[in-house]
Amino acid sequence: MAGRSDPIPDEAAEWLAEEGVAGAAPRKGFPAARAEHRVSQQPAFVLHSYPYRETSLIIDVFTRDHGRIALVAKGAKRPHSALRAVLQTFQPLSLSWSGRGEVKTLTRAEWVGGMLPLGGEGLLSGFYLNELLVKFVAREDGHPVLFSHYVETLNKLAHGEPVAFTLRAFERVLLRETGFAAQLDRCVDGEPVQPDGDYVYHPERGIRRALPSDPSSWPVLRGQTLLDMERDDYSRPATATQSRSLMRFLLHYHLHGTPLSTRQILIDLQKL
């Protein structure tokens, strides 16, 4: 457990501006855009941390009710800081913060516990989840359903459940909860997906019947695959293969071709 009550330093906003974080700018000399914002004991996970000056960190956290938040953890790099041991990835935390603007100040951090640590391919997969959240979840945009699924996914990885199937399920929920994907068991025209039909996923509209004129880069999917994915059932070999192709396609499209470093490592290891 650790508590801090210092106001947000102007240098934190300057650091974010230098790092290219959208909306960040030095606060010195400008009126406050928003009133002081205080949040207490919010369930959260650390996604990533950045060194800030000699003794502090800026942490990117995923919270249950507030989405992604950037927090200054003052003194967290000191050898004997209580925060140093608490602010670890893949561990459930209870965080409190205050401030206005893009960056808030961490005022309290407590380790909640109750989850096994990740190891091996599960650990690498966890970093992949975090990279997806950083890319797709906007700051201060709450996603309680996605947060719950993130916790469930970490638990599955920690208990050694099949990595590929576990990640497919998370990718599907991520894209749906952030508004980038629709349901998979119904076409855009309202027609139910038929198990023996051939379909494509129009990246801006959703599922429809496959046509000869469709771009060759769009994977053709059997209806049974889509129905299986909607139920998170990846046990059929065809579903496992086609769902991987669909998720690669949608992630590539919505990231505008920007590669995910952790995903490429997993592909190289033939785990994804």
Curated annotation (Swiss-Prot):
Record bears the keyword DNA damage: yes
Pfam families: RecO_C (PF02565), RecO_N (PF11967)
InterPro entries according to UniProt: ARFGAP/RecO, DNA_rep/recomb_RecO_N, NA-bd_OB-fold, RecO, RecO_C
Source species, domain of life: Bacteria
GO biological processes: DNA recombination; double-strand break repair
Keywords on record: DNA damage, DNA recombination, DNA repair
GO CC term, one of those recorded: bacterial nucleoid
HAMAP family: RecO
Functional note: Involved in DNA repair and RecF pathway recombination.
Family: Belongs to the RecO family.
Record protein name field: DNA repair protein RecO
Organism of this sequence: Ralstonia nicotianae (strain ATCC BAA-1114 / GMI1000) (Ralstonia solanacearum)
Origin organism lineage: Bacteria, Pseudomonadati, Pseudomonadota, Betaproteobacteria, Burkholderiales
